[in-house]
Design a protein with these regions (language model features):
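Helical "lid/coupling" subdomains associated with nucleotide-phosphate turnover
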Residues: 1-177
Length: 177
């Protein structure tokens, strides 16, 4: 099954810990008490949201930033403030963190809802999480009473190669290789 097939069937929820854009999930966000529309420009990404909320470390932030600037807490807050066409001095740290929290909530709600639907459709009893966000998913699924194995916790650095290995195995089984 290709990624296109998975998207068509709803089996691929294409959102991630690092490169997803903030407006891919948010149209409006509550900032400092005001519902505020979000710019569609690429001002910040999911890595900024997860970084300022403590879900990933600076070392985990392994992709280029939206503005080419440094990967620091302050720089991530500034990028997040740009999502509502603002500067950090205008909305403050709390406003930028509201944007981050709203994005992560939308992202995790989407993932949890789709995983529940897919598990029901396929009669699955548990899931496997892998990748840089596996610890986020493991907690999300535990809170949602979904049994989950965190490959990163179980296999360490070798877990990074497991999704590629799974694709190769699937390709072999379907005769692609």
């Amino acid at each position: 099954m290709t990624d296109l097939d998975r998207l068509r069937k709803g089996y691929l929820v294409y959102t991630g810990t690092l490169r997803s854009t903030i407006p891919s999930l948010l149209r409006k966000v509550r900032v400092n008490g005001f519902d505020t529309f979000v710019s569609s420009e690429y001002f910040a990404q999911s890595a900024d949201a997860h970084f300022v909320l403590g879900n990933i470390t600076a070392g985990d932030y392994s992709v280029p930033t939206a503005d080419g600037a440094e990967k620091t807490y302050a720089a991530s807050l500034q990028r997040l403030s740009r999502v509502v066409c603002s500067d950090l001095s205008e909305i403050g740290e709390s406003g930028a963190k509201e944007i981050a929290a709203a994005f992560v909530k939308e992202q995790t709600d989407l993932i949890l809802g789709e995983v529940r639907r897919i598990m029901k459709d396929t009669d699955s009893k548990s899931i496997i999480a892998a990748g840089i966000g596996s610890h986020i998913l493991t907690k999300l699924f535990a809170d949602g009473n979904i049994p989950c194995t965190d490959l990163n916790a179980d296999a360490g650095i070798f877990a990074d190669a497991l999704p590629a290995h799974a694709v190769m195995e699937a390709a072999k089984r379907t005769g692609i290789f």
